[in-house]
Amino acid sequence: MDTHLNEKESLELIGKMINSAKNNLQKGLGDIFLLWGYLVAIVSLSIFILLAVLPGESGYYSFFLWSMMAIGVPFHISMIRKMEQQKMVKTYIDKIMGSVWIAFTISVITLIAGMLITTVVVLPSFKEVEPGHEFLRWIPWTLFTPFMLCLYGFALFVSGKAYQFKPLVTGGIICWIATLVLLVSFHHPHMMKIQELVLFVSVIFGFIIPGHLLRKKENGHV
């Protein structure tokens, strides 16, 4: 038996669909930002501490801690699947932003893999370096953090504009400013420590704070 809707019921149905789409647009996003935000924060802070505590070149081996980022992949996949199961309406923005973050993830994985491989290849070629210049073996890592922050800035800014969520836009701008700060501080003798500390702070403002605000918005508290 066919059910005919009057004009009022049709408008109410359309309104519910729009609200559903808007709500589902944010559903689960906060957890994803928190996952990667806390993971990057833990790794960057750990590297900063190890660089400060360990003597000489031994501290630079802490950069291999970035391989721990792989821990977040299965959790990320699980969260995405849960979001897709709960999502009633998949908008065009969802599809575009999905592609943006896939491209971002591939870029980060490529960057981390490239740094690790380059380090393994470059290390043997610097068998003898002058005392105090051991950092020359780890030159590729001086570009790693600025590149990461620039990618963060792009992804956060685009996401913030697409979802009309200002904290993400602000986080993206902060990451871009941090990138400039790091690029002009290459001459500093403690540049690697500075990079990890700047990355730690940037992730707090770019991922962790927006992530918690997104969760509040999902629960209707914002």
Residue ranges with predicted function:
Residues 100, 104-171:
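Membrane-proximal helix-loop-helix units in multi-pass membrane proteins
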Residues 1-31:
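N-terminal juxtamembrane cytosolic/stromal segments of multi-pass membrane proteins
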Residues 23-30, 34, 59-62, 94, ...:
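Membrane-water interface of alpha-helical transmembrane segments
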Residues 20, 76-92, 154-161, 208-215:
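C-terminal ends of transmembrane helices
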Residues 27-121:
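Selected alpha-helical membrane-embedding segments in polytopic membrane proteins
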Residues 49-60, 117-138, 185-192:
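Helix-coil boundary and interhelical linker segments in multi-pass alpha-helical membrane proteins
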Residues 152-222:
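Terminal transmembrane helical module of multi-pass membrane proteins
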Residues 62-70, 135-148, 197-201:
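Structural signature of hydrophobic alpha-helical transmembrane segments
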